[in-house]
Amino acid sequence: KVNKNGPEGALTYTGVTSIMGTSMIGTDKATVVQKMVNQYVKSNAIYPSEALAVGGAPDIITFCGILYDEAVAENIKPEIIYAQAMLETGYLKYGGIVQVWQFNFGGLGAVDGNASGECATFPDVRTGLRAQVQHLKAYASKETLNNSCVDTRFNMVTRGTAPYVEWLGQKENPNVNSKGDSYGWASGESYGFNIMSMINRMN
């Protein structure tokens, strides 16, 4: 039964999805990882085994396992990190500012107009995913990090300004700074809604 006075009750009426908390697609690691893997396979993308093996993830199962552990460590729903990574990298095909060897799965530091490779670079897959998780936590809450900070842009975020997936897009985020600019992860229209659309197809 939903508590109408509690946060989960509020979510059912506001139509937004909390970034923090336990997975919405499974109650254990094996189930959640399998659903992420299945979604990747359905995309018909070819996993960049050679490039990501160098960073410790030779296959999509290993990648999703690392992703799950890093998300759970900071109380972030793993499927949100997965969907965002797939959206940002085109199912790990890359092709934009960020290159596969940079182990940057969230477009960290890839500001509109930057040249190829002009963004954050990490030493391996786990560190890259950890940075993405930490950056998302910066937007989602004001809680301290559980792991040491590897996200060099963590302190650039105004904490807690996008607690919901749907608010990750600046155009949909109701919070604004003193200049009247909206907060959020990305400037693209419906950014957070596109993440949720992918998650909804995983159940």
For the regions a protein language model found, what residue spans apply to each?
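Short, aromatic- and glycine-rich surface loops/edge beta-strands on solvent-exposed regions
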Residues: 2
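Catalytic cores of secreted/periplasmic lytic hydrolases that degrade extracellular macromolecules
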Residues: 6-203
